[in-house]
Amino acid sequence: MWRAGRAALACEVCQSLVKHSSGVQRNVPLQKLHLVSRSIYRSHHPALKLQRPQLRTSFQQFSSLTNLSLHKLKLSPTKYGYQPRRNFWPARLAARLLKLRYIILGSAVGGGYTAKKTFDEWKDMIPDLSDYKWIVPDFIWEIDEYIDLEKIRKALPSSEDLANFAPDLDKIAESLSLLKDFFTAGTPGETAFRATDHGSESDKHYRKVSDKEKIDQLQEELLHTQLKYQRILERLEKENKELRKLVLQKDDKGIHHRKLKKSLIDMYSEVLDVLSDYDASYNTQDHLPRVVVVGDQSAGKTSVLEMIAQARIFPRGSGEMMTRSPVKVTLSEGPHHVALFKDSSREFDLTKEEDLAALRHEIELRMRKNVKEGCTVSPETISLNVKGPGLQRMVLVDLPGVINTVTSGMAPDTKETIFSISKAYMQNPNAIILCIQDGSVDAERSIVTDLVSQMDPHGRRTIFVLTKVDLAEKNVASPSRIQQIIEGKLFPMKALGYFAVVTGKGNSSESIEAIREYEEEFFQNSKLLKTSMLKAHQVTTRNLSLAVSDCFWKMVRESVEQQADSFKATRFNLETEWKNNYPRLRELDRNELFEKAKNEILDEVISLSQVTPKHWEEILQQSLWERVSTHVIENIYLPAAQTMNSGTFNTTVDIKLKQWTDKQLPNKAVEVAWETLQDEFSRFMTEPKGKEHDDIFDKLKEAVKEESIKRHKWNDFAEDSLRVIQHNALEDRSISDKQQWDAAIYFMEEALQGRLKDTENAIENMIGPDWKKRWIYWKNRTQEQCVHNETKNELEKMLKVNDEHPAYLASDEITTVRKNLESRGVEVDPSLIKDTWHQVYRRHFLKTALNHCNLCRRGFYYYQRHFIDSELECNDVVLFWRIQRMLAITANTLRQQLTNTEVRRLEKNVKEVLEDFAEDGEKKVKLLTGKRVQLAEDLKKVREIQEKLDAFIEALHQEK
């Protein structure tokens, strides 16, 4: 016990000593400090200089488990025991800090290099999208100039607001730990997850296949999108061309327009373009010269043409058909090597690879656009102009390659179509046939040589070209075979000249310069030239180009004047026919007639806005009543009128009117308004305009009317607004003056008399002719009509006895009528009695209602004063006044919608339809027909061709 007391006293002494010596109270225990921080803390803290490093000293020295003496608590000598430790702690601290710095620096350098390497790998995996920049409109790249990012940044929420919406990560971690515990406990779901993991490996092949299908689908969608925008671009270019033509034709006073002089070959190319359209329209063929390039598929036609044009301008494929439609290439000399299409103003710089790729892509798109669905090739021609220094002036037509077998994916008639296209061009007696033959294949496999020999058996306009001579020299065992081909002894055909060319090593990425150098180098070192098997003027594409150009212009000078004379005769015949048949009419072609019809149609649409409001409301009110009168009388008035008191009548009417207004009435009103607008529009479009009316526009006007009506849709909010207006109108029961009362009675009488007339006709058809018609017109009743007549007479007797008989017959009354008829020898069925009763009672009721209507003429005073007179209750008059007022208000509302909105929307639809028809040439040909239109079209085309031919001939003579 005394030891424990001494130990406690010693602890208190130590604690007080430490507090007095330190002067600062610590909040953090020393054990919780870092190792380095603890050493610094010991060295600098004045209290710790007086203590041992071990804080458990008190416990160790004064515990009951030890027998150590108290003399160890002497404090004075202990302060010198820490002197060596105080001398070395800065060195240890510096060593540790330096080690930490190297670790951090090394990690940063290694991590940065790894991150850069990973980023470069990811960057290489991303495909190059620069080829598709042209798809994105230009304004996308300039969009940052129109967006104020500062305003957007201010509109975005602050980081504090976003932090409030952030998920609670602690809760998510807790949920994930629970899920982990759940699955690690061996739940049944573990098996399912493992099965899924094993199944994922088996699905890899399916994923690869599906990814390939997605890529193919995206490529197909991209192609369709390109074709769509290609059509839009062509339409805009066509409009731009027409506007440019109008601007050039406009003769402004005081402004001198300089006439641009065209080259001779450009003028000739324009003549061929016009003739091509004329030939396609009238299924004829002109006889003007052009160079027709024919050959077997993959024989090198396109390569020869590219060597002549000195540019890789055509799309290429390894063994597959790439030329799907004829391509007319007009070569002319110019300072810059450029290409442009006939219907486009864009120039492709053929010295730039980007423009060359764009040109090839454009040609491929145009070919696909020309090919109709279900076909592989098309006879429609693509016209391309190529200008450049050193080019020989001529016009060449590249045709699809002749094939021997139709492969899968081709249309069944592909072979015949290619033959017919080739024959159509080669049948021209002035066409120069450039026959391309692959020298690397056996001559016996040639298809085109037989076709050429049929079209030009004497060889007066055929030039034979043997391609791939380098491969032929390597593969052919006997070089004399090539000599036989060039001399025209091997093939069963004749030609003006024979040429041998080399069009490269088969690499599509080769440039024209590289191919030309390879060709010259080959022929310089070739055994064929060294052994005089080939002559120098028969080799290289340059010599071929010069020879073809000379032959082309020789043909042009010999045949162009004869062609011009034939068109002069055609023009004279057409003009004479027009003067004899249409002496007082101008020669308007289809486009001019369409513009004239367009103006007439727009004038007729504007006439809709001239219709008076009174006329609109009258026809709307009348049409609406004709549409709803049956429902009002049969389903509202007649059921309510069967009641015996005023309260039940009004209740029934209000319920049925409310149901009718909520469901059917607004829709019926809109339908009536739309039909009324159609009728008025049709009336203005079809009514004759007197002697000036031209029936040639009737089909066009009818088509425009139908298409405009089909596109027009009434405003969606019209029914909702009408429902409120009609409901409020039907809720009003207060007739303010005698004039409105009389108008309601007149409206009611007119409606009931119409129904009574229909009922009388139904009864007459049921019972047959009366005695007057039987005597005058010699008509007799049938047996059934006689039975109906006897039944009617019996039922009328019943009504005379009881004028207030209800609407339905009781079973005993039916039995009584049947027995009375049987007593007179008339057998009748109960259903026949009911049918006859319906018409008889309906006539009786309508006559009673009309008599009551006459009584109510003088009942306005009682109604206005609210007198209760059971003998004169005019609730039915009030009902018809409510209906009449609803019709008037609805007609007024619909008239406002028509004049303010719908007429303008219809006019807009008509303009859109006319614009669509103006762009659709087939539609105009279908709608504007007749001998007069066709004759005007022929005259216009022939005049244009003759004018261009005369201008070309004049320029040709000047060049001589």
Curated annotation (Swiss-Prot):
Query: Residue ranges of region Stalk region?
Result: 589-836, 874-928
> Intramembrane residues, please?
771-781
Q: Where is this region: Paddle region?
A: 736-856
In its record, the post-translational modification comment is: Cleaved by OMA1 or YME1L downstream of the transmembrane region in response to different signals to generate soluble forms. Cleaved by OMA1 at position S1 following stress conditions, generating the short soluble form (Dynamin-like GTPase OPA1, short form; S-OPA1). AFG3L2 is involved in the regulation of OMA1-dependent processing of OPA1. PARL-dependent proteolytic processing releases an antiapoptotic soluble form not required for mitochondrial fusion.
Span list, region G4 motif: 467-470
Give expression by tissue.
Answer: Expressed in brain as well as retinal ganglion, starbust amacrine and horizontal cells of the retina. Absent from nerve fibers and photoreceptor cells of the retina.
Tell me which PROSITE patterns the record gives. Answer: G_DYNAMIN_2
User: What intrachain disulfides are recorded?
Assistant: 856-874
Q: Which portion of the chain is the transit peptide?
A: 1-87
Protein name per the record: Dynamin-like GTPase OPA1, mitochondrial
